[in-house]
From Swiss-Prot:
It is found in: Cell membrane; Cell junction; Cytoplasmic vesicle lumen; Cytoplasm. The keyword Hydrolase applies. Its cofactor is Zn(2+). Changing residue 152 to M: Found in an individual with partial ADA deficiency but no immunodeficiency; uncertain significance; 1,5% of activity. Changing residue 199 to P: In ADASCID; delayed-onset. Changing residue 60 to A: Moderately reduces enzyme activity; reduces ADORA1 and ADORA2A modulation. It is a peripheral membrane protein. Changing residue 211 to C: In ADASCID; late onset; 4% of activity. It comes from Homo sapiens. This is Adenosine deaminase. Belongs to the metallo-dependent hydrolases superfamily. Adenosine and AMP deaminases family.
Length: 363
């Protein structure tokens, strides 16, 4: 019998990677069809290699993508399909609004230097990747009733890609794209300050493109400070190490900064050591602005309920706190104000809360 969900009500998810949310069966299908060698020939076997049960370092985790991304990247049909199936997956998890992120360049094989995953050069550009993902998400939204929007990722080790990423954010604003992100290895010294990234974020500010940044996951509070002060981020991806700098944390609390928290992910990537108190407990106790998210459910062999079960069982989270954090997630979403209001109304109704509960940002 399936486990009863820890929070069986509509949910909002803001931090999840498309390329970390692919069905194993879909990877196998395109691997076979395209003649690309995979480390196993069954879904279960594939999960045993790609999936994680115990903590690894972040670089070891990132190496997991090398196993399966060649089966998907560069294939138009596969890219549209993974976006469509992603929405179906979220519908089953009780998500009513999701922002899914990905790097257009890491799914392309043309007009990208270097070409990723040892692919031969083809004719699928980052521009067309964004169009295909948008189509898949829109068809998924129509068929499964989950509102789905996308965030385009710059990669820390490829600042030369970033100017194109912000241009694609502008071009596809009407086709699901709502924001820009900076992802990848944040331990690369000074990577937040590389001119390609800084210029892309300056252009995003100028053009009214929303901004989030992976910072303080395994990097220091200094990386968080750079994300806030230099890249002008509106949300923090993870942000756990903000707590190393109490003055910074207090400032961000006052500014109502939103933390995109991924509890199960933080355990498996070693971003959080289980013998220490998880940052999310402090955020809960302070009634701060944060959400719960899966990050990369394929690799973490998880669903959103995994994160809710973990916080309920191990950290004393209550139904009331789950409601509060989802309302904060909706308020901190990158939707236009009218659509945000509709989403909040849906949540208030489902949670049996009066709409006047929206008074006060942190409820």
């Amino acid at each position: 019998m399936a486990q009863t969900p820890a929070f069986d009500k509509p949910k909002v998810e803001l931090h999840v990677h498309l390329d970390g949310s692919i069905k194993p069966e879909t990877i196998l299908y395109y691997g076979r069809r395209r003649g690309i060698a995979l480390p196993a020939n069954t879904a279960e076997g594939l999960l045993n290699v790609i999936g994680m049960d115990k903590p690894l370092t972040l670089p070891d985790f990132l190496a997991k993508f090398d196993y399966y991304m060649p089966a998907i990247a560069g294939c138009r049909e596969a890219i549209k399909r993974i976006a469509y199936e992603f929405v179906e997956m979220k519908a089953k998890e009780g998500v009513v609004y999701v922002e899914v992120r990905y790097s257009p360049h890491l799914l392309a094989n043309s007009k990208v230097e270097p070409i990723p995953w040892n692919q031969a050069e083809g004719d699928l550009t980052p521009d067309e990747v964004v169009a295909l993902v948008g189509q898949g998400l829109q068809e998924g939204e129509r068929d499964f009733g989950v509102k789905a929007r996308s965030i385009l990722c710059c990669m820390r080790h490829q600042p030369n890609w970033s100017p194109k990423v912000v241009e694609l954010c502008k071009k596809y604003q009407q086709q699901t794209v709502v924001a820009i992100d900076l992802a990848g290895d944040e331990t690369i010294p000074g990577s937040s300050l590389l001119p390609g990234h800084v210029q892309a974020y300056q252009e995003a500010v100028k053009s009214g493109i929303h901004r989030t940044v992976h910072a303080g996951e395994v990097g220091s509070a200094e990386v968080v400070k750079e994300a806030v002060d230099i890249l002008k981020t509106e949300r923090l991806g993870h942000g756990y190490h903000t707590l190393e700098d109490q003055a910074l944390y207090n400032r961000l609390r006052q500014e109502n900064m939103h933390f995109e928290i991924c509890p199960w992910s933080s355990y498996l990537t070693g971003a959080w050591k289980p013998d220490t108190e998880h940052a999310v407990i402090r955020l809960k106790n302070d009634q701060a602005n944060y959400s719960l998210n899966t990050d990369d459910p394929l690799i973490f062999k998880s669903t959103l309920d995994t994160d809710y079960q973990m916080t309920k069982r191990d950290m004393g989270f209550t139904e009331e706190e789950f409601k509060r954090l989802n309302i904060n997630a909706a308020k901190s979403s990158f939707l236009p104000e009218d659509e945000k209001r509709e989403l909040l109304d849906l949540l208030y109704k489902a949670y049996g809360m009066p709409p006047s509960a929206s008074a006060g940002q942190n409820l």
